[in-house]
Amino acid sequence: MKYVVSLFLSVLMFSARAQVKVSGKITDTKGKPLYGVSITLKDTYDGATTDSSGNFSFETTEKGKHVLEASIIGYRPFEQELTVAKDPISLNISIKELVTELKAVVISAGSFVASDKNKGAVLSALDIVTTPSANADVTSAFKTLPGTQQVGESEGLFVRGGSATESKIYMDGNLVNNFFYSSTPGIATRGRFNPFLFKGTIFSSGGYSALYGQALSSALILESNDLPERTQADLGVSVIGIGGGIQHLSKDKKSSWGVSYNYANLWLGFAINKQKQDFFQIPVYHQGDANFRIRTKSGGMIKYYGYISANKTGFRSADIDSTVLKNAFSIENLNIYQNINWRENFGMGWKLTTGLSYSTNKDDISNELQDANNQKQVIINPSFFAFKNFKLRNNAQYAQARFVLDKKLNGLNVVRFGSDYFYSKEKSTYTLFDGSRFAETVTDNLFSVFTEADVFITNNLAAKIGGRVEHSQVVDKWNIAPRVSVAYKFKDNSQASFAYGLFYQNPERKYLPTVASIDYSRAAHYILQYQKMTNARTFRVEAFYKKYTDLYKTSVSPTGREAATNNNGFGHAQGLELFFRDKKTFKNVDYWISYSYLDTKRDYLDYPTSIMPSFAANHTAAFVVKKFVTKWKTGFNMSYNFATGRPYYYFKYDNAQSKYVIGDAGKTINYNSMSFSVNYLPNLGKTNKKTFLVWVLGINNVLGQNQVFNYNYNNAGTKKEAVTPPSKRFVFIGCFLSFGIDRTQDAINNNL
């Protein structure tokens, strides 16, 4: 017995001597102690957990080389090789926070996101179609956000002192030419595409990604839907027309196809809303589209979208140079657009996105000088009357091929690179009053390569760094455009962002061809943003400065054609923008407020000096409020848009100085417009609904406030006429049905 006790004590003493203490402290990269970190010697049972001070301690009988592991959710796993001998081991360990999508800062300087799933979303997809002043038009909805101008006489997005041609629109990465219906004098046309085609929208008012180019001011980036939730059909009837479509999802939910057709005839709409123009051809539109989508075995997606539209309109308006003559303008348009894309994951962090697009656009435009009996008049003297009789035929073809390769690195870090090739051929035939014809063709081959990296240093600090190189046949020169954005997130989850970039653009088609040697126009963007977002509120303030160089100057030929002559133009735009959205303060009420201050001047085209352009206002603001009353099954939406007066000018040629000078100038009245809409959902609350029905009533400019967009001058500059909307207000009534899918909850959530 004595021997056994002695042996037992010897073993205890040996074990005590053989144990080695391992201790230390674990902190994050900022020195903050981490509680609950699990520490173990790999492939053993020895280990411990840190206390509230980050300290740990354990003993081990292991000897030799081992790997110490430390792990905690939200941080990168830590490993360190150490040698266990006789002496205690003391360690001070610092581990890095794991960069995750839910916690990471969002690089957002210059951009607004509209998506139901994106955590940085400011507007959802349904917001776009329920904003009263937008009339279910994608671009019009973004006019309630800061940075955009309230230009009512011309289509397009006028952003931060830039013209509409300085904003480009992309669908699934490919540039969309003729996104809007063809222009008509003094009337802004709307976009061609249904907003429900898109699952995501990014509106960048500056500093946009190196993946896109040829836009001096902004980019609107649209991403089309993938597979539908289920098979469904839609039907709509309104005062402007009728339309319907179907989306069919396969039984295995791996593919779908869809078609739609819309017919618009504004006879009834114009009967309700009297127009100031005398329409001899009521606007008529035929529009059809088709799509298919296929999910690949590896989870990728192939998407095709095809669109065709044909439309025509014609109207008479008083001629400003005469008290008895009229101008009869007419236009017929045929537009075809096709886009196919393939997105695929190849494993090992590689992703490929490719796209092909092809489109054609044909415009037949005619203008006649007519008398009181609507008979054509050809007046040779004075000569400017003669040029009011003309015909113009435009034929354009566009094609684009594009690919982007993404390589995912550790965490959220990604590097991407790619290239695109863009082909355009635009032919114009101009026929004068005497039958003389002038035909011009402009062909361009634009090639670009680009690269961009998302670098997440921590969850709180990230950068997007990239660049783009382009070569255009028209300019016959290369350009290099660096882009960089940096964002930092504070402890209260607010964040600050900075963006810088160079942006280049070719001259507009209407100023080509030219015999002059020309270069790209260029703009440098500097953007500083502060933003705080919660589930219920969004606040952001953004300051920007934009410097224009090498803007095009133009001159007019004896036939009245304006062409680019040099790149001596320049300009600047600077300002401050505010945005606030609140879904919390008032029960069941969602509202947002935006404000923009803009200081801009430029010398370009035929401007005689550096002046504020006629499409810019110093102050713009918008207020949108929405409330859904479940008891009444009704949603109420109101928007108010405001802008201070815009400048207008009359340029006349001074023979003594051999240049244009300002003959007259002024400012329009302030722009005010309140719009209202009501959505009634009669099926709300019913069970086993197979049909989702919405009645819509919308009124633009409810109060009938006077609006003046600009002024037109007669040839001598002695008379001017205000450019005003076609009607004081517009009343829209429609009924929309969806068969096979219930969107009631979407409609409710959108208004809560």
Map each language-model feature to its residues.
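Flexible loop and strand-edge segments within Gram-negative outer membrane beta-barrel domains
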Residues: 266-267, 281, 299-352, 360-397, ...
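Short loop/turn motifs that connect adjacent beta-strands in outer-membrane beta-barrel proteins
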Residues: 99, 150, 211-212, 227-232, ...
